[in-house]
Structure formats: C-alpha cells, structure tokens
Amino acid sequence: EFYGNLSLIRQGFLDDKILNFFENLYINTKELEELDDDYTLLCSINKKVNAVNDDRLSKLESPLVCFKAEICKESKDIDEHKIQTWIKSLNILDELKLKIGARVIFCVNNWDKGYYNGEQGIIESITYEEDKTYIGIMKNNGIKIMLEPYVFFMEELEQNNNEMFINVLASVSQFPIKLAYAITIHKSQGMSIEKLVCDIDHIFENGQLYVALSRAINPATLKIYFTKRINFKAYFASILKFDISVREFYQNNDFLDLELENNII
C-alpha cells in the first residue's frame, strides 16, 4: 500500500484514502523527542539540519576530529569556479566534523568496500597508520568496516586524432559520510533510510514531498512531522506540488519505478 500511494502522489494524484494513510504516520513534537536516537530527520532547510547535527554531536563527550577534503588539480589552467561548482555537486563535506560514538550515514555506493548510499552506523574508532587514516564504523547490520577516504574524479570526454578519451581535470578525496541525525531532502536523493522522520515544513519544490517520503525503506519506521497550525490533510495536499507534464508522462507511458522496485525487494 505504501509504495502504491507513493507512486500515485508522484503523479500528482491524491484522495482521502491516500491522505488517511499518510496522516496515520504523523507525529507531534513530543513524539518526535521520544523517538529512538537511530531515526534520521529529513527536512528542506540546511540551517535546521546543521543545528540538529551540531547539537547531537556536542552531546558526545569524545574529542572532536575534523577531516578536510583534499583537492588535487591536474592542470593549472582549470577554472577554479568550475572546480568548486563540481565539488558542491558531490554529496560530501568540505570539512567533516566527527566524534567517536557519532551516528553517520554513507553518501555513496561502494559495494566492493561493503557500504551503500543511505546505510548507517556508529563510529567506533579513528586510527592513523603511516600516511593513512581509517574510520572504524559499526554498521547497523552488525558488520564493522574500516573506512578510507573516497576519491571523486572530475572528468571530461575529449577527442584527439579522431579518438575519444577521458581526461581527468581534478580530484577530491574525502570520507564519504555525514552525521546521520539530520539530512536535507536535496542531499538525500538516492539514499535508502531504515528509520526516517520526514519534516515536511517548508516544502517548496516540485516533487520534493515524494523525494522525502520515498527515502524510506520500511513504512513501519516512517514518521511525518510538521508544525503548521492547520489541518494535516489540507497542508499535505498544499505541498503536493508537481508539473502537469509529469502527470501526462505517467498517463501516456507504462514503466517500472526501479527505485521503488529495489526498495520492495
């Protein structure tokens, strides 16, 4: 039922049955404060995300450790603005602040190294061996990994003598994790989150409500939180924004939503 309702609101359809389903997931401020610590708050405002994460991190007694992203330019002729724009498009932090005991979320898929985008865990150790740094993370599934920095490459396809080749313009190295207490809806795209609270205050972009709700892996551990002084159903309907062209596309085409299919599996 959850995935069926998600599919419908993605197309801009809403009726009393769908509204009743999502209203049953609503929690108030008191209920939010009583939730387990392993829930992730998803909201649209970066300032609120930072405030939540900073507050939770400050309550840990272990020392603060900072990791600065390392940027490597392959050519001095590369436009600095272009590089910075590219780095901002990556789901990493320029300065990553962590403590032992902090709950973190992985921001990329790296199946070979044993983690995926949206998976979570607790930091158990930070170790330094020669010129390498490792972060020991106990994942929620009980498996511990020693995380190394992830290297992202800025590439362009170029042609030389009728041959195409990939030219690396720059690279950036950073641990592909963030604090998992709160994340913006925008930065959560592609993630699959086990225990999720969707703060739907200040939803303002087309499709943003769908993106937030569809991050949930398990509808049984999905909560919806908002603080507006209006009826939940009226507010939910008011933020279900979509493009008419999107609805027409779904009406005229048959397709599989691979993201929802993967979550169901």
Q: Where are each of the predicted segments found?
A:
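Conserved helicase motor core of P-loop NTPases
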Residues: 1-113
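C-terminal accessory regions
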Residues: 100-265
